[in-house]
């Protein structure tokens, strides 16, 4: 090969390599621009309800013939739709209940700054569960805790923490309230907060951290609500509220709320005579509540809520093993589904039950006279057969030598079914324990299980002699 041919050959090879490098640089540039603007190809919903985007850093190391290019690209995930909860999955089949959470608030109060509370409950958003309670505006080791046995003061506020986190000084005070209910519709939290004078209280409706609506007392006699979670189906939340006598006829209404705004109010209808402190759960396409009759019945009222047409039906749990306290001994107690049993109906305690086909799962105090001990069991035919008393799968949650209190239900949506859980309020202090001047509580929480389980007792556990007075 002569010199001229060598020069031409080297030049051709160099030109080819240069062309390849140029084309690769163009390809890199096109890829970079495409990935950078990919985020704009995602469709956003009309109402702009999206989850915040999370940046992802992509490192691309591209080796070329004689140099290294480090290209860093930041790309956003396409927005995810946030949808209302519809609770359309079936109820989980369970064999009983397994331990889930215990906050030990009273024991911790012996050496730390923990709020004085009562009326606790649990509710979950789509990703996490929270515990709520009505605080007394003071910690336990504080002279303001004296005489906190009283239910309604202007200092009471609704507290909210992750489940299992005691109400410490950093706890969020959601609203002013001496009666409350909370629920998450899939997009945001709704809090119903009642406060004010007994004869002219106000219920505030707080949605997504903002006051949206309110309603005043309609019977001028202690407007009050559930003290456990409300339920939202397809954006409509229902809450049961009562105003009027605690020992005679009262005026109960069911409020329908959408993003914090009251859209409809239905009066109680059906055969229930007195309804307070309902424990509600989704029973698609509606909502079902098991409540407290503080006037005539130790059997619990049932309220069925139709979310679509706002209609209401009510009756009583059929089980002859009744759920309220005080109550007659099981041998003598009765319930015939439609009416109050007129057995030690005056007074009572918040509680829960839920249907399982024709059967009923329920919880109650072990004592039939006082708020002592706690048990759960299933009654065969207890939802459909009058005065049914065949009990199976009994579990002791708190032994009869220890105090209990209010209890209520909350629901958790799993991958294939909706599980039912419950909490028990473990009251300590006044009136029974007169060494101290305060009244407060801790909680224990159980959830339904399809597995096996053992036995135990999960009382509050604080030694009252070690507690601040």
Swiss-Prot record:
It catalyses: Hydrolysis of alpha-(2->3)-, alpha-(2->6)-, alpha-(2->8)- glycosidic linkages of terminal sialic acid residues in oligosaccharides, glycoproteins, glycolipids, colominic acid and synthetic substrates. Pfam families: Neur. SUPFAM superfamilies: Sialidases (SSF50939). N-glycosylated. Its EC number is 3.2.1.18. Residues 11-33 are annotated as: Involved in apical transport and lipid raft association. It is a single-pass type II membrane protein. It comes from the Viruses. One of its GO terms (molecular function) is exo-alpha-sialidase activity. Intact N-terminus is essential for virion morphogenesis. Possesses two apical sorting signals, one in the ectodomain, which is likely to be a glycan, and the other in the transmembrane domain. The transmembrane domain also plays a role in lipid raft association. Belongs to the glycosyl hydrolase 34 family. This is Neuraminidase. The lineage of its organism: Viruses, Riboviria, Orthornavirae, Negarnaviricota, Polyploviricotina. The gene is NA.
